Amino acid sequence: MISSTVAAPSHGTRNYVIVTLAYWGFTLTDGALRMLVLLHFFRLGYSPFTLAFLFLLYEAAGIAANLVGGWLATRFGIARMLAVGLSTQIAGFLMLSAVSPGWGATLSVAWVVVAQGVCGVAKDLTKTASKSAIKLTAGDASGRLFKWVAFFTGSKNAMKGGGFFLGG
């Protein structure tokens, strides 16, 4: 039972916390994923150019997802887009876990590039949905919105760095 002197957290605050925690989990694993892929192929002796190529589709797919992400969120809802983004990241992880040491170099690199593309779509769908959800959660309180977005953005970057360390 909540006492009358302590206010219950608002529905908007609860949604903000849920979205932020989901995005933190996503960002932590995304940073770790990038480091694991990079270090794995570096250890196998791949050139810097090939290592950069591994992330080409990741970034290109992210651009495409950004272009349609807002429209998808409007059409299907922000919560659904957040769930789709998180699910797509899991699909990308499962694809990466299927890489076999017995595969040839060309097949391994091609498979990882496609899996990275899936993760690039996931990244931008999740980011678009998360930032949109935060803006809707704050309602008309623009000062509070600014603080929430600043915290969300800063914490996102900190989690990404944590993911790099986790993956390294």
Enumerate the predicted regions with their spans:
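Cytoplasmic helix-loop-helix junction between adjacent transmembrane helices
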Residues: 115-155
